[in-house]
Amino acid sequence: MKTIMLVCAAGVSTGMLVSNMQKAAKEKDVETDIFAVSPNEADGYLSTKEIDIVLLGPQVKFLKDQLKEKISSKNIPIEIIDMRDFEHMDGAAILDRALKLV
């Protein structure tokens, strides 16, 4: 199972994106645990849960270096979600990109 954590401003759009990614994973028969957290919650999840990849919403891309430093010892990839894919809520494209990085 691949665990994918999205860090975002925790809005409605991210909830829809998580749902679209979960649907795409089910269609591809890929076992995943995909969830979204706010920037304030990210540290807690990174220290208590096995995360395979961190995806940042475009609106919080400024956090990349800060989070990368915190997870450098864990070798967890961190990636900013493509703005176009985010705007189109393209869960399949975002999932494919995430799976290529793990």
Name the predicted role of every residue range.
Residues 2-5, 9-41:
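Conserved active-site segments centered on acidic
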Residues 3, 77-102:
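Ser/Thr/Gly-rich flexible loops in soluble cytosolic domains mediating phosphotransfer, phosphorylation
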Residues 15-18, 61-68:
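Short, surface-exposed alpha-helical segments at coil->helix boundaries
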Residues 19, 23-27, 69, 96, ...:
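Short, well-ordered alpha-helices that flank and scaffold nucleotide-derived cofactor binding pockets
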Residues 41-45, 63, 90:
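Short acidic active-site motifs
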Residues 48-53:
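Short acidic/histidine-rich motifs immediately flanking catalytic phosphotransfer sites
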Residues 57-59:
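Short secondary-structure boundary segments
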Residues 64-83:
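A short, gly/pro- and small-residue-rich
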